[in-house]
Design a protein with these regions (language model features):
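ATP-dependent carboxylate-amine ligase
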Residues: 14-40, 44-198
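A short glycine-threonine-serine/GTX helix/turn-capping micro-motif
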Residues: 1-6
């Protein structure tokens, strides 16, 4: 399989079970698994430099733990996790995400993620409550694009940077309005703005 993680093995096994009822040749299944990928699930984004940048939909503590535990097995120089938490959702999720990232990441970059009708800084304070249960290092960069820029400009050789929470989503929801925002486009913009491809 072209995607890492035990959770993806389970997904692949479920898919194999489902297609086994349709007389699909084994080789076709094998070939399909080799090229299978899901947008926003441990999705690599090509960047200049000797670090890896991944987009993942991990938007709760369990999914974040699965992704970060899997990526730890690759022994990165540093594992950097950028994430926020959705507004108008249970606060306990924020505490749990902060604690999970604090335990498993070398650096947490806390930012916005669909604040909805809540103040972004209130959400960030809740995330910090969870982080403070750990010895994890963190920085706060409330604007998501600027948080991504921070990660890219401070990346070191061998780092793995995970942009968690948005995944396949191409919007940011603020005060009841969904604004277009695709992390892939933000990354491309940052590469141009910072002349990183030169």
């Amino acid at each position: 399989m072209g995607v890492p993680g035990v959770f993806n093995v389970y997904n692949a096994l479920a898919a194999i079970s489902a297609v086994s009822f349709f007389d699909i040749p084994d080789q076709a299944i094998i070939d399909g698994l080799r090229v299978a990928h899901v947008k926003g699930r441990v999705e690599p984004v090509k960047v200049p430099g000797n670090y890896s940048l991944l987009i993942d939909y991990a938007h709760n503590a369990l999914s974040m733990e699965n992704v970060l535990t899997t990526l730890r097995r690759y022994r990165p120089h540093r594992l950097i996790t950028l994430f926020g938490a959705g507004g108008n959702r249970p606060k306990v999720r924020r505490y749990e995400m902060g604690e999970t990232s604090g335990k498993l990441s070398d650096l947490s970059v806390i930012t916005e993620d669909n604040s909805r009708f809540e103040d972004v800084m209130d959400i960030i304070e809740d995330i910090k409550t969870g982080l403070h249960k750990t010895d994890g290092k963190y920085v706060v960069v409330p604007n998501r694009k600027e948080a991504i820029r921070y990660c890219m400009l401070n990346a070191e050789d061998g780092d793995i940077i995970v942009l968690a929470g948005k995944g396949h989503e191409d919007y940011q929801e603020i005060k009841g309005v969904k604004y277009h925002m695709d992390e892939r486009e933000l990354i491309a913009d940052i590469i141009k703005e910072e002349h990183l491809a030169d």
